[in-house]
Amino acid sequence: MDTAISAKELTKWFGEGDLRTYAVKEVSFDAYFGEILFVVGPSGSGKTTLLSMISGILRPDSGTVNVDHVDIWSLTPDQIAEFRLNKVGFVFQDYHLFPRLTTAENVAIPLILKKKDWNESIRDAEHYLDVVGLKNKAQLAPVKLSGGEQQRVAIARALVAQPDLLIFDEPTASLDGDTGRRIMEFVKNRILNDSRCILIVTHDSRIFEYADRIMRMEDGKTVGIEKRADH
Amino acid sequence: MKGILKIAFKLLVNDKGKYAALLVGITFAVFLMVQMISIFSGILIKSSSTVINLGADMWVMDPAVNNVASSIPLPDYVLDAVRSIEGVNYAVPLYSGAALVKLRNGIFQPVTILGLDDHSLFGRPELIEGEIEDIYAENAFIVVQDAEVRKLGHPTVGTEFELNDHRGVIVGIAKVGASGLFGLPTLYTTYSKAIQYIPSPRFTISYILVEPKSPEAVTHIESEVRRLGYLALTKDEFMEKIANFYKYQTGLGTNILIMTAVSFLVGLSISGQTFYTFILENLEKFGALKAIGAKGRELIYMILFQAAFTALVGYGLGVGLCVLIIVLAKIRVPEYSATVTFTTLAFAFVMVLIIAAISSYIGIRKVLKIEPFDIFRG
């Protein structure tokens, strides 16, 4: 498998002097196209900070991140924004859907940011809503949808620009067990493909079975990467 | 860019409560500002109505005159002296004063009397009834058809009245560009008849109306009149002098200025606060947009668009409301003085842009500070 992400000696700290705390310390790993990599660990172990550095959101204090062979932190701020827009799809823990826009408009946002024509963007958004099984909800406001449906809208939004890298932050944290498993089945069977790498930050051990590999973190460091026996 | 502005538009107008509050703030501010200044503009125009209506290019007066209604009589020799100044095409006397007329029903009514030069009738109004030559008839007066004429009992040609025990008769009905400030009906007659009918001091010329031979002669005429110890002003200069009197010597201008400033501050605080709350409520969403890949300048455009759109709609509503109220007020109270000028509209427009700029500046600062990492972290 081709390398999608190559992180080397990534370090991030907050505070200065005696107050300096390492959120992530000298973490190195590779992730590959066609795999789902879980990043797991207790609260404060540095999972979200690590994913933020990999996705071009938070600049590391040292170390490098290559995504598809591009050192993203050597880019200008505008280029990094372009990188996030074109290469990364985010599914936030709280979804962050716009309540004043329709579901289709929410999904179309990445395309609109890419300056695609409004009507075309909405058409593409409706296609991805169809993919996640919500085509009939396209004109509804997100607040009228259930938690699981909102999660799927967020997934459609992350997919609509066809990114190489998909990042899920606690995707099942606010869902019941059945809905969480259905979402993960959907991600595994419909979203993952050979030209896409999916990173999932989670506490939820009920969904570990969907991982190809699991990277465990503690106190800002990697304590091990295990490959799932059945994958 | 069009797409992202459409998102901004939908985020704004679909939040109906906030949008309504924003509009109310700006509409209220614009309404108050335009209303205040329009009332003042109306007062200023009315205060210069005689100057506007008579249309003379230059006015000669006593230097102590500060508004057209408070004339100080000039000696007759000043008229001769002005006529002899090089560059003067012609100069004529004007009588301007107040008098009490007794109507046929026994009621006394104060009026403004304007006595026009007997030979030229310079400054005569446009007649809508009667012939101008009839002004030379015995006891003849021309009444102005304006908001005040009803105080004379809606006179027609032939209506009679008394003026200082003299019989007066209406021989014509005229229309003028602007009616007076003090709510008095206006009667035109000849200069000689005016000084004959109205008790006068030793000097009887209120103003000398001058027609210069060319615009270049104005400066020379002004300096020559100054050497005589009097003051010559162009029409615009005289109107400015009158306006300055009402602005700075009556307290009216200061009060209007204070009210306008208060209106601005009220509008700024309502819309600024509401816009800030709107931004705060959407802050996480702006952060999410940043995380997805929106650039800082795109978020700035969104906020500026929202602020500018609200400001323009509020401006339109405020001006519309103000005009509506002025029109309704004028139907009910004909002498109501308020005039919406282009200067007033431009001023209010600039003020509303300042409100929008300050409101959006606060929002932009907030949005630029939000880090996508904060959104990720929850």
Regions found by a protein language model. Give the residues of each.
Chain A
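H-loop (His-switch) and adjacent beta-strand-loop-beta switch element
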Residues: 214-226
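ABC-family P-loop ATPase nucleotide-binding domain
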Residues: 1-13, 224-231
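ABC family nucleotide-binding domain
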Residues: 4-5, 10-210, 214-217
